Amino acid sequence: MGGTQRPRRGRSGGAPSVADVARLAGVSTQTVSRVSGGARNVRADTREKVLRAMERLGYSPNRAAQALRRGSFRTIGVVTQHIERTGEALTTEGVLAAAWRAGYTVSMIQVERPASEDMRTAVLHLAHQGVDGLVVVQAGRADSRHLVLPADVPVAVSDSALVGYYPSASADQVRGARAAVDHLLGLGHREVHHVTGPQDSQSALIRSATWAARLRESGIEPPEPVQGDWTAASGYAAGERLAADPRVTAVFCANDEAAIGLIRAMHERGRRVPQDVSVVGFDGLSLGEYSFPPLTTVRQDFRRAGEEMVRLVLEQVDSGAAGGERQILIPTELVVRGSTAPRRERT
């Protein structure tokens, strides 16, 4: 007869114990304890046997008691901003996945603004919860002089002014922005305009500074950038402004959403992309594949940034040593699609 198999009882007839799990899995009770505690120094096949035995017996370890015994709740605190934005959401997904694989849970706080005071409040709240480590996904331009992270808690950060002061994992913004500008210059465009990201974003500032520096290296004075805020609406507004200038033939947008908004504005005002205006975005979001035309962009691996930050935190947890100022730069990749083309001479 079908149906869900009922959990077995332990030898004494009561709830199953660690010894019952060990007996069924053919391992020691110490191994069962290591698996239930999330330890990583257990062979994959052994872990699988123990987990199957737990499931078959209906065994559930007392997490609170385990935490009290070892002085750790196996929890990573995460501070993020704009979780509704695709990039931050993907990075947070990477954090969650890596933490889960390592046997850790996540306690997350989303701040409304990346101001130092908001960040400080969130960090202190998580530290008081007794988290084993902290991951700061987005701190914007929060000043390291005014935002001091707890010295006794392992920390990793990404894409903020805190990079260089704490262990970090971030996309190589400089190489990515240079690749975007070089691509447009290589197509013969004599000037590359720029739609920025918000001024409280460290990654946006790096992309803008790299754009300007690369143009100057090529003997070109950068035109006045157009302020954006990551949204498609800001890109659309920038596109309306730039479309009115017939001299504009190339635009580097600080992110994909703004680039897609700009492309629509160009089309609506009779400027064809890429025949009249070439457009490059940044991020490599999947929606760029389905824009019209498909968007040339700089792809960054958001999920890997989250995974690397967890790895940096757990290395500090395992070693008991601070991570110093170690920086992991994650490579970016120029993805050439249909929104860029060689510059056409005006007739």
Give residue ranges: language-model regions.
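N-terminal helix-turn-helix DNA-binding module of bacterial transcription factors
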Residues: 1-74, 344
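Alpha-helical recognition/docking segments in bacterial nutrient-uptake
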Residues: 1-4, 13, 75-182, 186
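Flexible loop/turn connectors
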Residues: 11, 245-347
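Short acidic/polar active-site loop segments enriched in Thr and Asp
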Residues: 28, 74, 132, 189-191, ...
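Hinge/beta->alpha junction and helix N-cap segments in small-molecule ligand-binding domains
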Residues: 63, 81-90, 108-117, 169-179, ...
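Periplasmic-binding protein-like
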Residues: 128-138, 193-195, 225-226, 246-255, ...
